[in-house]
C-alpha cells in the first residue's frame, strides 16, 4: 500500500479507519467503475462484499471513465460534460499537467476530452508513493488534503467537478469532495495523465493509446517524479 498507493499505516487503527472510509466512499457513489478480467479477480472478494452490502449500487465497466478507448464511436460526447465547467485536476504530475493544458486542443486527433470552454485548476496531493513517503500516517495527509481542497473551493477556484488521481487517497478524497464539499467528482486514477497527453510506461505497448500519440504528447517532467519511481509498479506512471 505504501510504495504503490502511498498509504502508510502506523498501527491497526489506521487499517480499520481506511477500510471503513473506503467502503463508505463506495456506498455513496452515484456510479461505480468495476474492472474486468484479471483486475476483477484480484479484488473479487471485495467486489462480492460490495454486491452483498449495496446490491442496488449502479455499476459500469471502469474503462467507461477512460474516453480514449471509445473516441471513435459515433455517439461520443464525453467533452460535453465539461462545457462551461470549472474543473479541478488532482494529480501528482502537477507541473507537466499545467504545461499540457495549452496543448489540449491538439492532444487527440479526432474527438476531444475537454470542451474549449473548460477552465482548469491543478492541485498536487501529498505524494507518498515511489519512495517519496515521510513518517506520517495516511490520516495526516488526508486531513491536510481536505483542508487545502476546502480552501481552494471556497477562496480560489469554485470548481464544478474534480477529476482525481492520487493513489490510495483517491476514493476517499473523491467522497469528501462529493459528500462534504457538495461538488461532483470522478475518480479516474492513474490514467488521468492520459487526458493531458502525458505518457507513462504502463501504456507504452497499448495499441489503443499509441494510436492517439502525436508531437503534443510528452512524458512527466523530472520535477513530477518521486525519488524512486521504479518502486511503483516498475515506473508505470513515468
Give the residues covered by each predicted segment:
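A short, acidic, amphipathic alpha-helical segment used as a generic capping/interface helix at domain edges
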Residues: 16-20, 141-155, 169-171
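Electropositive, gly/pro-rich neighborhoods at or near active sites that engage anionic ligands
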Residues: 1-117
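Gly/Ser/Thr-rich loops at beta-strand to alpha-helix junctions
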Residues: 37-40, 92-97, 163-173, 192-193
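Glycine-rich phosphate-binding "P-loop"
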Residues: 55-64, 121-149
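C-terminal functional extensions of proteins
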Residues: 169-238
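Short acidic/histidine-rich motifs immediately flanking catalytic phosphotransfer sites
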Residues: 157-160
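Non-catalytic interface/targeting segments
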Residues: 81-128, 139, 209-238
Amino acid at each position: 500500500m505504501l510504495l504503490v498507493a502511498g498509504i502508510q499505516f502506523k498501527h491497526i487503527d489506521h487499517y480499520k479507519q481506511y477500510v471503513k472510509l473506503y467502503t463508505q466512499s463506495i456506498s455513496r457513489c452515484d456510479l461505480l467503475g468495476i474492472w474486468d478480467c484479471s483486475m476483477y479477480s484480484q479484488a473479487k472478494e471485495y467486489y462480492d462484499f460490495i454486491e452483498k452490502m449495496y446490491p442496488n449500487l449502479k455499476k459500469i465497466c471502469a474503462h467507461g471513465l477512460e474516453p480514449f478507448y471509445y473516441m471513435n464511436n459515433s455517439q461520443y460526447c464525453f467533452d460535453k460534460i465539461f462545457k462551461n465547467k470549472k474543473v479541478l485536476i488532482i494529480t501528482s504530475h502537477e507541473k507537466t499537467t499545467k504545461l499540457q493544458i495549452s496543448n489540449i486542443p491538439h492532444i487527440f486527433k479526432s474527438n476531444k476530452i475537454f470542451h474549449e470552454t473548460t477552465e482548469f485548476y491543478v492541485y498536487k496531493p501529498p505524494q507518498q508513493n515511489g519512495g517519496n513517503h515521510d513518517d506520517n500516517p495516511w490520516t495526516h495527509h488526508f486531513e491536510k488534503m481536505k483542508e487545502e481542497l476546502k480552501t481552494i473551493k471556497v477562496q480560489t477556484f469554485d470548481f464544478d467537478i474534480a477529476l482525481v488521481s492520487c493513489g490510495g487517497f483517491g476514493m476517499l478524497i473523491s467522497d469528501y469532495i462529493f459528500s462534504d464539499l457538495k461538488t461532483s467528482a470522478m475518480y479516474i486514477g492513474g490514467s488521468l495523465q492520459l487526458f493531458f497527453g502525458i505518457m507513462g510506461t504502463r501504456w507504452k505497448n497499448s495499441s489503443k493509446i499509441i494510436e492517439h500519440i502525436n508531437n503534443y504528447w510528452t512524458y512527466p517532467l523530472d520535477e513530477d517524479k518521486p525519488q524512486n519511481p521504479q518502486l511503483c509498479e516498475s515506473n508505470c506512471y513515468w
